[in-house]
Amino acid sequence: INPKLNVTFEETLRHIVRQDPDIIVMGEIRDRLSAETAVEAALTGHKVLSTFHTEDSVGGLVRLINMEIEIYLVASTVSAVIAQRLLRRPCPACAAPEKPSVGALRRLGYNPSDVHGSEFKKGRGCPKCRYTGYKGRAAVHEILILDEHLRSAIINRKPPHEIRRTSIEQCGLVTLLEDGIVKAANGITTLDEERLVVSDSASARVNVIRFNREIGRAVQQECRDRGSIS
């Protein structure tokens, strides 16, 4: 992008659209201009991929609205928002089974019975991980797919916490916290990482206690699929 040479977002988009691409990938949406460009590209019928820096998936919708994009455009052009965090993996060379404390689980909105049969792990520290107990990273995701319930909430200008409640109660959104619990229960990451990276987000905890039984069953089923529960 070089405005002095007339290489602007709008001009570049016109040239890209003329090439009839299947997917348009844009850089980070930081301001109203880049947001409008992304929306205009989506209005041409093309699939547009871009990025935000937000706390969670609902934050992406809020960011577009705060950039003064028309509500009806946000509701009609956005198909999905994916939030992710990177959590450290326990070192495979020194990881050992760990039984999480009742207090640690309850601080995350869970009871021991919700994760019965899971295989939590924690690295003890070794030369291969430089005595950190961790090696590599794994992503936890929150995938918000817009349907008629969410589009209606956006058009009716519901506040962010109401949009998030709708996404959880009516659309079955699995939050970053819940996805992290499933991965921790399968030894992919640790509860310490979950608390450090994810659970500090207040919005990540909305309604999590209400859904802990359902997620607990999902954890146990995933463990069965992996052959960890006989």
Task: Walk through the language-model features, giving the residues of each.
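Positively charged, low-complexity/disordered segments
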Residues: 219-230
